[in-house]
């Protein structure tokens, strides 16, 4: 086993119990392509038992990365970081907390066509969300092409939203298209679902321009990690769909100004990486 932990300089995160040596990390090092670095892997995971300090260590690295000039987006499904403006007054002006609730004023805010800047990205995400909710596989030669055609048609409209996909399916007026339209529409009755479905008139109101952005979604009901997809309840399907949209939006943020080191922090990542 190696006794080499971390870098020679960087953020102090603790010390090795075996050697007594301090451990430092430079989170941005792997992304800079520095000659001689051991890895250029950009993904990190905090794994351990309940109460083992995963969140604390994670929060520490994000905090110091921001102090060193980085930019971060934290997806906080359990809303554990809502008080950071008060507890971190030294960077309060750079903290942006986005609270997403099922209030009617937020209708359509997380519609793929609203939240994604690029239409092609929005179209791809729309397909992902609708196939996830309905369980229609891309290998389903009867239903998938019909759904795909409706989504592509909506993407070509000047204003677009997921509710228009239902309209396009009804215009097709076949037994298959009506069945898919009814299936998708059955989700829109839930208060929570209105975040995902817009009529094309909603404008993106989520900004990630601050150095530290925290996205919180109220009332998420996440499935247990041992629950199979077939056992998900409707509200669990919608909750995971919302996490997929937000995480895709956050990852899109990575591709903005590449001169700035960025972190996308997915708390409870197992819920949508399973």
What positions do the PLM features span?
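P-loop NTPase motor domains
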Residues: 2-22, 79, 86-89, 102-274
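Glycine-rich phosphate-binding loop of nucleotide-binding enzymes
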Residues: 9-99
């Amino acid at each position: 086993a190696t006794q080499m932990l971390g870098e020679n300089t960087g953020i102090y995160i603790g010390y090795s119990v075996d050697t007594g040596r301090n451990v430092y990390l430079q989170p941005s090092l792997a992304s800079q392509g520095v000659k001689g670095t051991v890895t250029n892997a950009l993904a990190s995971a905090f794994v351990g038992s309940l109460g083992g300090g995963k969140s604390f260590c994670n929060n520490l690295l994000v905090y110091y990365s921001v102090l060193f000039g980085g930019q971060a987006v934290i997806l906080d499904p359990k809303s554990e970081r809502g008080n950071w403006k008060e507890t971190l007054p030294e960077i309060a002006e750079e903290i942006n907390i986005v609270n997403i609730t099922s209030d009617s004023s937020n209708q359509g805010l997380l519609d793929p066509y609203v939240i994604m800047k690029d239409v092609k990205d929005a179209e791809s995400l729309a397909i992902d969300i609708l196939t996830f909710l309905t369980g229609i596989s891309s290998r389903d030669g009867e239903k998938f092409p019909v759904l795909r055609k409706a989504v592509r048609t909506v993407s070509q409209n000047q204003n677009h939203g997921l509710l228009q996909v239902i309209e396009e399916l009804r215009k097709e007026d076949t037994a298959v298209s009506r069945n898919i339209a009814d299936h998708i529409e059955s989700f829109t009755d839930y208060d929570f679902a209105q975040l995902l479905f817009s009529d094309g008139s909603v404008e993106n109101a989520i900004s990630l321009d601050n150095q530290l952005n925290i996205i919180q979604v109220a009332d998420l009901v996440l499935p247990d990690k041992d629950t199979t997809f077939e056992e998900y309840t409707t509200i669990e399907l919608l909750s995971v769909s919302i996490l997929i949209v937000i995480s895709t939006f956050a990852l899109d943020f990575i591709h903005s100004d590449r001169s700035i080191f960025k972190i996308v922090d997915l708390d409870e990542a197992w819920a949508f990486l399973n």
